Every structure is written in structure tokens, then in C-alpha cells.
A protein has these predicted regions:
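N-terminal intrinsically disordered, low-complexity segments enriched in P/E/S/T
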Residues: 1-55, 59, 63, 71-233
Length: 233
């Protein structure tokens, strides 16, 4: 199973719709998502299909986690014996939410990549039209045991490695990236983060949302480079 989050534009979004047969498609309507509460409601209404946690406990991070962790039952209900492929499309071009809320929403999506990694093939597409010149940069969820394979796959690229095991503060995380990578080379960049549990629930959510925002908006969107980020668990 694999999980990825890819930056695309609206033209690529149109092409994406041509290849969705047999997949569970979740579309998040940014026009209806003004804050993180709206986002939580939108994503929960899509994935909470087993025990209806949202009505038992309300719409929050913990209900979202509990609903997502029912991945085995979700596969049986929606796919049976067929391959379980899920596509989430979120057009976030207008950046309506506050920066803090956007960071939390990215943390939700990254957590889903980890929680569903053993049962479902998850492809997340964030649509950011007219906000970057370079598209198809992405975040890939993988296992730490595959680190050597990743090195071989990405050789001859600008590779940066960072272990997050002792990293609990977003400020430290951001400073280490800014100090070690200037994104001035023309070659593709590959960022590898070991022990990426901080993005799921390893640290305070306010720190995690700042880290997630750094990866998606500051790096994937604003650097205008072809970038691939591996979050290893």
C-alpha cells in the first residue's frame, strides 16, 4: 500500500477525473471550508462510515482518528476483495482558512496517509492554481526500513536527511531546514524525514501544524523547485 500527497493545478485536476473508475473519491469543497471546524466536518462526513463517531463524540481530532483507524472495516465495506484505492481532491487555491487552520488541515491529511498506509492506497491531491510555477511536487509516506532503497532511487539529486525523533518544537524544525537547504540548485530536491510520528500525534498539535505548513506551503509551493518529501515511519 502507498500514500502520497501531490501539488497539482486545475488543469491537472480536470485530467485526474478521467482516471477515477473503481476508486473511492473524496472531494473537499473549499468554498464551504472557512476554518478548521468546517474542514473537520467535511472530512469526517466522508470517512466516518463505520461506527458514526461524529454523532457519538462530535467532530474533533479524536473522532477523526477513531474513524480513520477503522480502515480494515472500511476496506471490507467499500472494496471487498478488490484493490482499495482512495483519492482525496482538495482545491485550496483561495487559501480561505487562516494559516494556523491550514496547517492543522495538512496535519489531518498527513495523519490519514499514515493511518491508512497498511490497508488502502491513498492519493491526496491539493489544488493550488496560480500559486507556484512547479507542480507535481509531493509528500510520500514510507517505512524507515526502505531508506536505502530510497537513496538508490533518488541518487544524483539534492538529498537532505533529518531525524525527527528528538524534535518537538516547530521552531527548531524550521531553523534546521532553513540553515541546511537554500534551494538554489537546479536539480530536484529530496527531503527525507525519519521518525515522522510528530506529524501524526507525537507532539503538541500547534507545533505539528507549523511543521506541516512549512513542508506544504513554504517548501512545496513557494520554492518553485521540483521537490519530493519522504516522511518515514
Amino acid at each position: 500500500m502507498g500514500s502520497s500527497l501531490t501539488i497539482i493545478n486545475q488543469e491537472q485536476q480536470k485530467k485526474l477525473y478521467k482516471n477515477l473508475e473503481g476508486k473511492w473519491v473524496i472531494e473537499l469543497d473549499s468554498e464551504k471550508i472557512k476554518n478548521i471546524n468546517d474542514f473537520c466536518i467535511a472530512i469526517m462526513d466522508e470517512i466516518d462510515i463505520i461506527y458514526d463517531y461524529k454523532h457519538l463524540y462530535g467532530y474533533d481530532w479524536y473522532s477523526f482518528r477513531d474513524a480513520a483507524m477503522e480502515s480494515e472495516h472500511i476496506v471490507k465495506k467499500l472494496f471487498g476483495d478488490k484493490e482499495a484505492n482512495v483519492v482525496i481532491i482538495y482545491d485550496n487555491s483561495k487559501l480561505i482558512m487562516s494559516e494556523i487552520d491550514r496547517g492543522i488541515s495538512y496535519q489531518y491529511l498527513i495523519a490519514l496517509m499514515q493511518w491508512w498506509s497498511n490497508k488502502l492506497n491513498l492519493e491526496i491531491y491539493l489544488v493550488f492554481d496560480n500559486m507556484t510555477k512547479i507542480f507535481n511536487s509531493k509528500i510520500i509516506r514510507d517505512d524507515m526500513s526502505n531508506e536505502d532503497k530510497i537513496f538508490k532511487l533518488e541518487e544524483n539529486k539534492n538529498i537532505f536527511i533529518m531525524d525527527l525523533k528528538q524534535n518537538e518544537l516547530a521552531d527548531e524544525f524550521i531553523k534546521r531546514i532553513d540553515k541546511n537547504i537554500n534551494f538554489s540548485n537546479k536539480k530536484e530536491y529530496v527531503l527525507i524525514f525519519n521518525n515522522s510520528y510528530n506529524f501524526v500525534q507525537g507532539i503538541d498539535y500547534q507545533e505539528a501544524e507549523l511543521m506541516a505548513n512549512k513542508l506544504i506551503e513554504d517548501i512545496l509551493l513557494k520554492k518553485n523547485k521540483k521537490i519530493k518529501i519522504y516522511l518515514l515511519f
